[in-house]
Each structure stands twice: as structure tokens, then as C-alpha cells.
Design a protein with these regions (language model features):
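Alpha-helical scaffold segments
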Residues: 1-176
Length: 176
């Protein structure tokens, strides 16, 4: 009886009832008054987007969510480098929600999917080069096109020629 009392929260919900509810349907987390880390982890395992309803996010809960669905990074209140790297590994497009991008994180994203160059805040020639090597069409997002970057893009996909700036197109065609 004493142990049972300890498990009850303000609204009279027992921990076991709450756990069972979120195991059945993660959406029920929105109605759990006294959320524990265990209950929140269960909900996020069931549906990573339940992170939206977690009142007190911990790094463990956030990592669990982004490992399953990188785009849930959008709902992480306090991003850490570890959370961001897990999110980008799961889905390179999660880079769009990274508040403090690092060179390494951007490089990892574009190597996995060159089109994520669109979300790189500070482009470098190396990041752009890696992006177009993965997808020639990433050239459309390159802010500072160099001959080397354009050539790599066209090597990867001849149709990337469409995105070479007109002033550079003639020079590029001469070198082919």
C-alpha cells in the first residue's frame, strides 16, 4: 500500500497506468500530468514526435527521439553537439534545424546527401565540393561557384550544367 501511494501523482495516475498508456499510444503523453523520464522515454520510443509533449527534456530523451527520426531535432529545446550529430546521421536534412552548425557536422550531412548544402549556413569550398561530388544538382545551392566545384558537379551529373552560372559556363565548356 505504501509503495502504491508513492507511485501515484497529483492527479491520481499511477506510474504503471501511465507507462501502459504511452506504450499503447504515445499521444497519451500529452495527458500525463507527472511525467517521469521513464514514461517520456517510452512515449518517444513509440513515436519520436512525442518529444513535443515532453515537459522536461533530458539529453537521453532527445537522443532517443532523434535516433529514430532526425527531423525531431526541430523540437529539441537545448541542442548539444551529440544530439545534433545523431539527428544528422539519422537524416541529413535535420541540418536545417541545427542552431550552431560546425564544419564537421555540415561535411557529414553533405557527404550523405549533397542537397543538404541548401541548409549550410557557412559554406566553404570543401563543403561545396563534397556536396557536388555526392549530388551534382547541389550546385544550385553553391554561393561561390569555382571552376573546380562546377567541374565536379558536371562530372557527377551532366545535367548539373544547368546550374553553372552563365558567366562560368563558357569557360567550363572550353575545359571539357
Amino acid at each position: 500500500m505504501n509503495n502504491e501511494k508513492k507511485l501515484e501523482n497529483k492527479t491520481g495516475e499511477s506510474k504503471e497506468i501511465c507507462l501502459e498508456a504511452v506504450r499503447q499510444d504515445g499521444l497519451s503523453l500529452a495527458f500525463v500530468e507527472n511525467q517521469t523520464e521513464e514514461i517520456c522515454l517510452e512515449a518517444v520510443k513509440r513515436d519520436p514526435y512525442e518529444l513535443i509533449y515532453v515537459k522536461e527534456q533530458t539529453p537521453e530523451i532527445c537522443i532517443e527521439a532523434v535516433k529514430q527520426e532526425g527531423m525531431t531535432l526541430e523540437y529539441v529545446k537545448e541542442q548539444t553537439p551529440e544530439i545534433c550529430i545523431e539527428a544528422v546521421r539519422q537524416d541529413p536534412y535535420a541540418l536545417a534545424f541545427v542552431k550552431e552548425q560546425t564544419f564537421e557536422l555540415c561535411l557529414e550531412a553533405v557527404r550523405e546527401n549533397g542537397m543538404t548544402l541548401e541548409y549550410v549556413k557557412e559554406q566553404t569550398d570543401l563543403i561545396c565540393l563534397e556536396a557536388v561530388k555526392q549530388s551534382g544538382f547541389a550546385l544550385q545551392y553553391v554561393k561561390n561557384q569555382t571552376e573546380e566545384i562546377c567541374l565536379e558537379a558536371v562530372k557527377q551529373n551532366p545535367y548539373a550544367l544547368k546550374y553553372v552560372k552563365k558567366t562560368d559556363r563558357r569557360n567550363l565548356l572550353r575545359s571539357c
